[in-house]
């Protein structure tokens, strides 16, 4: 992970203010009076640009969206994480009932669409406290703007990759259960959220501790509005749903700990709050006056929905918890920000709406344990288990959660339904395929787009775990059930490579969260397409595909070009070989295409051969005029979805030389029990090489291993997490060699083991190694101690020397190789357009082979003589009116 990406709100303007030259933002010195900020209290001071905000100027702009003379929208500019100002057309996005909004006109929320990125949607809350924003976009992390000073208008822009991993995660006490039988029997043949936008009446209560944290009733309502802006942003995009805070909400915002109806947090989060909230809402609000109720606490570290899918359901007695029994309360005493809003509030309300847990580290028998380990979507348990994909949830619902919530709400009568006027898009997951074992593949989807929306695409495996839990919940090649592939946030591409193509390039076909299978399995995948629409217009659509893994075929893999320091010359003849392993018998796999990448496997735009037999061998001519230091080969069937990439990068037009050097860090290193990292560094002398591979040796001891976080930072500031809160309550030592090709950690093993890091080390590849490398370690939770006994980093790099170009006369026909074992290439420059004919005769003049080809400026075709006996043959090449005869020897 990169160090926090820190930009400052440089400018915020509106079309109504273009005549003014004064910006509402003023540059201030970073260190000025920031000691009182909550951020600094967290022990993580900011670095970067800081600005003070003229709230009155911004307020006058946004006020144009309200009042008797209100406009439908205005255009504002805010910075994105590239540091560029991005324009958004914004509209009102109130989280309040109309009466409550009239009562608090200065607490507002807005929604906006980017004018330059159709997938980007802005959600913005504004009040006397200041502005807070969230931008959801595909292919990039979510972006936030937050106030970071209590007494000053100082703001920062960051993204979700910058969220601090020491924020304590959610512990959800909601007991998962299958929805009631009437809902189970409902069919879900519809694959979208339909054409109805739903609105629910939300009652939010808060403890006196929550109100005191923000400074009073009004300030608590500001904070609730900020949280709901983020939560409603997710619900709008994924569920076509909006929660409106009821008009008499202030009666539920308690200020006196002695008078509020809730137990202290230490007992409340253990279950007392569910019934206490339900009773309070029944008494103060009345069951007929809200659809869903939730309590915000300020400490205790827990969440509990009370029941699953019981939105709209009234309690049947004073001891019954129904629609008004959910609560969220953080462990770190900070009931605000992305962790609280998404990991806590969106998760627990997701339960109330009808979604079960999606993790598979435990199997709850609900049919939706479809994420490996902890899971990473909203209804997972990111950062909580011994098998964490990541520290916190990504801000979207998995397909199974969307489906559960949609099915549940379809059975309810309390939502206010509004017809979505736009024609919905239609997802297409493509055909079903049969693929070989242990072979990468790519899912290819598409979607109609009748409204020209900024569509985003999310492929997810949809196989629930039935027996694979605990240590077996991770992905591994012989896993018999459950997920092999984690969920990733939506992208602009309708295709997904499995595993990630960067992992395939790094030869990492098996990792804890993405693994190919070595056994026969039937895998189910769902494509969810989001239109990222504004309030009342957002829709999703899904489609499924089935991938059958045939264990009698495969693996399909390239066996050539797999040695270090390999280089090619332009126009040279090269042999490419691959293991067929019966894959030619699979549907659509009798023929293959062979492609070339010159950018390390990011793309394969160059076809070396098309529609050639899947027979395991092909001679090719290296294209003229192409050079590259990081080239790879890809072979794919012409009508199937599996593929192979050769295992080593090679050069075209360069000779290469690789070397490896090990650099030890000074040890021992005391692991600090603070939010601050302890660091040690090594220095790599200046050179022009590129990183080929990085491995790390690490030996550390700790009384509670899961408290430990260890990272490696390269000279460019790129951060890779090596160890991140793993191995639970293990007490002792771990001796680890981190290699991307390593396996999962065996937590109780105290002898050396080669393991894959928490994040892949290949992220350092191709970067220059020169400069300072930093090892960072900390224990953010007090109570246990530890030490790094030894640590070293091995950096392998590669140098390149250009190959002098030698002129080649292609006016004459060249035949390579000669002698040959059977296959040879005919190469020449054809200036005609009348076709090329190649004829093979034996010594007696008998015609053996005759083939016709289309002309090409650089003609190169492979002729197969495998079936012929050893001997001398004559090759006749007819290019229009020109005829050339060559002799070739087969041995």
Regions found by a protein language model. Give the residues of each.
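Exoplasmic/lumenal beta-rich domain surfaces
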Residues: 244, 456-519, 593, 598-618, ...
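C-terminal outer-membrane/trafficking sorting elements
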Residues: 1-11, 15-19, 806-816, 820-891
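Fold-level signature of zinc-dependent metallopeptidase catalytic domains
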Residues: 21-24, 29, 33-36, 156-309
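The catalytic-center signature of Zn2+-dependent metalloproteases
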Residues: 246-272, 317-395, 460, 465-470
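N-terminal prosegments of processed precursors
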Residues: 20-148, 272-273
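Acidic, Ser/Thr
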Residues: 444-451, 462, 579-584, 828-831
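Loop and turn regions of beta-sandwich accessory domains that flank beta-strands and are enriched
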Residues: 613, 624-629, 640-806, 819
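Proline/serine/threonine-rich low-complexity linkers at boundaries of modular beta-sandwich domains
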Residues: 409-426, 547-556
């Amino acid at each position: 992970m990169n160090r926090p990406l820190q930009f400052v709100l440089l400018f915020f303007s509106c079309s109504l203010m273009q005549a003014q030259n004064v910006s509402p933002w003023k540059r201030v010195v970073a260190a000025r009076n920031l000691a009182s900020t909550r951020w600094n209290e967290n022990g993580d001071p900011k670095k970067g640009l800081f600005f003070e905000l003229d709230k009155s100027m911004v307020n006058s702009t946004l006020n144009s969206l309200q009042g008797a003379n209100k406009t439908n929208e205005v255009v504002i500019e805010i910075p994105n994480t590239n540091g560029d100002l991005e324009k958004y057309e914004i509209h009102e996005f109130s989280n309040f009932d109309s009466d409550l909004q009239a009562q608090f006109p200065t607490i507002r929320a807005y929604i906006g669409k980017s004018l330059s990125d159709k997938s980007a949607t802005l959600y913005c809350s504004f009040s006397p406290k200041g502005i807070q924003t969230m931008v959801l976009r595909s292919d990039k992390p979510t972006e936030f703007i937050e106030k970071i000073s209590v007494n000053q208008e100082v703001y920062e822009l960051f993204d979700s990759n910058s969220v601090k991993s020491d924020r304590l995660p959610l512990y959800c006490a909601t007991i998962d259960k299958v929805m009631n039988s009437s809902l189970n029997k409902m069919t879900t043949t519809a694959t979208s959220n339909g054409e109805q936008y739903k609105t629910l009446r939300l009652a939010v209560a808060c403890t006196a501790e929550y109100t005191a944290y923000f400074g009073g009733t009004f300030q608590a309502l500001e904070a609730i509005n900020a949280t709901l802006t983020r939560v409603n942003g997710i619900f709008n995009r994924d569920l076509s749903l909006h929660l409106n805070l009821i008009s008499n909400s202030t009666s539920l915002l308690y200020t006196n700990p002695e008078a509020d109806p809730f137990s202290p947090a230490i007992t409340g989060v253990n279950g007392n709050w569910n019934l206490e909230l339900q009773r309070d809402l029944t008494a103060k609000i009345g069951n007929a006056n809200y659809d869903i109720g939730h309590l915000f606490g300020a400490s205790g570290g827990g969440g509990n929905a009370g029941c699953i899918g019981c939105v709209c359901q009234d309690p049947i007695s004073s001891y019954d918890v129904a629609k008004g029994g959910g609560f969220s309360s953080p462990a770190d005493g900070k009931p605000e920000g992305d962790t609280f809003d998404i990991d806590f509030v969106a998760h627990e309300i997701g339960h109330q709406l009808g979604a079960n847990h999606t993790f598979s580290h435990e199997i709850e028998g609900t049919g939706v344990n479809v994420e490996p380990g902890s899971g990473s979507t909203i209804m997972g348990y990111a950062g909580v288990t011994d098998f964490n994909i990541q520290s916190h949830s990504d801000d979207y619902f998995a397909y199974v959660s969307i489906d559960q919530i949609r099915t549940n709400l379809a059975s309810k009568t309390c939502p206010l339904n509004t017809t979505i006027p736009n024609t919905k898009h239609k997802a297409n997951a493509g055909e079903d395929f049969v693929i070989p074992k242990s072979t990468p593949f790519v899912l290819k989807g598409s979607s109609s787009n009748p409204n020209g929306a900024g569509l985003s695409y999310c492929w997810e495996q949809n196989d629930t775990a039935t027996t694979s839990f605990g240590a077996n919940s991770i992905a591994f090649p012989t896993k018999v059930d459950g997920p092999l592939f984690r969920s990733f946030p939506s992208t602009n591409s309708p295709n997904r490579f499995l595993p990630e193509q960067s992992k395939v390039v790094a030869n990492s076909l098996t990792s804890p969260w993405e693994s190919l299978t070595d056994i026969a399995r039937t895998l189910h995948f769902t494509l969810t397409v989001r239109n990222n629409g504004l309030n009342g217009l957002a829709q999703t659509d899904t489609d499924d595909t089935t991938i059958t893994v045939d264990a009698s075929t495969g693996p399909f893999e390239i066996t050539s070009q797999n040695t270090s320091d390999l280089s090619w010359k332009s126009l040279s003849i090269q042999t490419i070989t691959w293991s067929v392993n019966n894959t030619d018998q699979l549907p659509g796999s009798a023929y293959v295409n062979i492609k070339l990448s010159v950018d390390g496997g990011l793309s394969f735009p160059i076809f070396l051969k098309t529609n050639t037999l899947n027979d395991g061998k092909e001679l090719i001519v290296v294209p003229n005029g192409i050079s590259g230091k990081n080239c790879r080969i890809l072979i794919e069937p012409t009508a199937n979805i599996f593929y192979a990439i050769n295992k080593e990068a090679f050069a075209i037009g360069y000779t290469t030389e690789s070397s490896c050097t090990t650099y030890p860090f000074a040890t021992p290193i005391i692991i600090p029990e603070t939010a601050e990292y302890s660091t040690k560094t090594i220095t790599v002398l200046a050179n022009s090489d590129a990183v080929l591979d990085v491995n790390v040796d690490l030996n550390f001891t700790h009384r509670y291993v899961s408290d430990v976080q260890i990272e490696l930072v390269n000279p460019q500031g790129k951060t890779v997490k090596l160890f991140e809160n793993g191995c639970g309550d293990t007490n002792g030592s771990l001796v680890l060699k981190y290699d991307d090709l390593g396996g999962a950690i065996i937590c109780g093993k105290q002898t050396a083991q080669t393991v894959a890091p928490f994040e892949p080390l290949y992220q350092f590849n191709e970067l220059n190694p020169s400069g300072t490398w930093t090892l960072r370690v900390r224990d953010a939770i007090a109570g246990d101690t530890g030490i790094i006994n030894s640590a070293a980093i091995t950096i392998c790099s590669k140098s390149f020397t250009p190959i002098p170009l030698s002129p080649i006369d292609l006016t004459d026909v060249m035949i390579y190789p000669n002698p040959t074992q059977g296959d040879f290439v005919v190469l020449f420059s054809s200036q005609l357009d009348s076709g090329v004919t190649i004829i093979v005769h034996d010594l007696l003049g008998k015609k053996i082979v005759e083939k016709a080809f289309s002309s090409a400026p650089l003609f190169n075709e492979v002729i197969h003589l495998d079936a012929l006996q050893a001997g001398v043959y004559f090759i006749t090449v007819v290019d229009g009116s020109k005829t050339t005869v060559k002799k070739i020897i087969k041995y």
